[in-house]
Amino acid sequence: MAKKVIGEIKLQIAATKANPSPPVGPALGQKGVNIMEFCKAFNEKTKDMVGFNIPVVITVYADKSFTFITKQPPATDLIKKAAGITKGTDNPLKNKVGKLTKAQVLEIVEKKLVDLNTNDKEQAAKIIAGSARSMGVEVVD
């Protein structure tokens, strides 16, 4: 018989930097989860993604056990890293802060495809290119 789910917690945590301080500790403590056990497991699982904020979905069961799923870093983080910028622009129509090649966009699509709401790489490339444009990053050939 399946365990009874009592809650689902969605967080974005820097890879390998989960610790009991806010926001992780209070969010998990409210559901009665062993915070240190989660932190150790999360840090171990994300050791190869250093430098990114990792979305994580934690499912908490009635017996206070948990499972978690890590997703790929947000598209904006991948775009910023590929374009070599620290942040996007506040006015993407006037200010361009960086450039991405189509090859870089396809590289981001390969990483992000499992989290996007499409299975078509061309459509996924349009989604990533749109995110880049809204940050003031040009997509060039």
Curated annotation (Swiss-Prot):
Family stated for the protein in its record: Belongs to the universal ribosomal protein uL11 family.
PTM info: One or more lysine residues are methylated.
Superkingdom as given in the UniProt entry: Bacteria
Annotated GO biological process: translation
Native organism: Campylobacter concisus (strain 13826)
Cellular compartments per GO CC: cytosolic large ribosomal subunit
Keyword set includes Zinc: no
HAMAP family, per the entry: Ribosomal_uL11 (MF_00736)
Annotated keywords: Methylation, Ribonucleoprotein, Ribosomal protein, RNA-binding, rRNA-binding
Keyword field contains Ribosomal protein: yes
PANTHER family assigned: 60S RIBOSOMAL PROTEIN L12, LARGE RIBOSOMAL SUBUNIT PROTEIN UL11M
Self-association state and partner proteins as the record states: Part of the ribosomal stalk of the 50S ribosomal subunit. Interacts with L10 and the large rRNA to form the base of the stalk. L10 forms an elongated spine to which L12 dimers bind in a sequential fashion forming a multimeric L10(L12)X complex.
Gene3D superfamilies tied to this protein: Ribosomal protein L11, C-terminal domain, Ribosomal protein L11/L12, N-terminal domain
Molecular-function GO terms, alphabetical: large ribosomal subunit rRNA binding; structural constituent of ribosome
Annotated gene: rplK
CDD domains: Ribosomal_L11
Role noted for this protein: Forms part of the ribosomal stalk which helps the ribosome interact with GTP-bound translation factors.
Protein name: Large ribosomal subunit protein uL11
